[in-house]
């Protein structure tokens, strides 16, 4: 069924999580980037339009600065023996890493797609780009303009500026605008993009083969769930595996994304991006995932 969906879909959003993009040591996986670019190029040769939602700015920032980030609950970065430190609290450090890492991330994507004579375009989004009608219309127009010219849009949240836990700026030093709220995770961002663009398919690549009835990393008897027709019935009753320090989402955000898009008639596939050639394997029917079917 997943193979048939790929064959029929003309407009596909592919979301790539940090867990998928990062190697075990936290550095971006160049081989995965190359595989993904090759698969997207193949899809485009078949007449499909592809939008990529890519996490990984913080991971790329860590790699670029040759330092280690703080633990998930920590406040700040450890000193690196040759590079010193990035001072500040946890949120400020993450934003600084994202500022450095986003440039590194898009550079690596550009190189990966250039091998297939494909150009990429960068979108750094905020929640208001989807909640404000004028800004949403501009996003949709620019996406369409690029796609008509066979450019691959690569989207991420503007993590260098969007954060909910940094100190507020004094009133006399800020412009009087409504406070910015984060999208918070790229599962949600990819769902927003799929809805705005009216995609035919949303693919979420994670580090596990879809949804299970319990955590497969902790339970050997965990059962894979290949098909979901009622997202609400899964809430609190399923698992995707243990969380990874590189990611911000989890099973809850993926179920939220599935709920949003399936209500709009868009199918969602959750699959493992760590397999060899994950996208092409799904297209051939050689890889398994969880398919969330649209609400009828």
UniProtKB/Swiss-Prot annotation:
Q: Does the keyword Nucleotide-binding apply?
A: yes
EC number(s) reported in the record: 2.7.2.11
PROSITE patterns of this UniProt entry? GLUTAMATE_5_KINASE
Q: List, in alphabetical order, the GO biological process terms annotated in this UniProt record.
A: L-proline biosynthetic process
Coarsely, its chief localization is cytoplasm
**Compartment(s) of residence:** Cytoplasm
Q: Which UniProt keywords apply?
A: Amino-acid biosynthesis, ATP-binding, Cytoplasm, Kinase, Nucleotide-binding, Proline biosynthesis, Transferase
Q: What reactions does this protein catalyze?
A: L-glutamate + ATP = L-glutamyl 5-phosphate + ADP
A GO molecular function held by the record: glutamate 5-kinase activity
- Entry protein name: Glutamate 5-kinase
Query: Upper taxonomic classification of the species?
Result: Bacteria, Pseudomonadati, Spirochaetota, Spirochaetia, Spirochaetales
Q: What gene name is given for the protein in this entry? A: proB
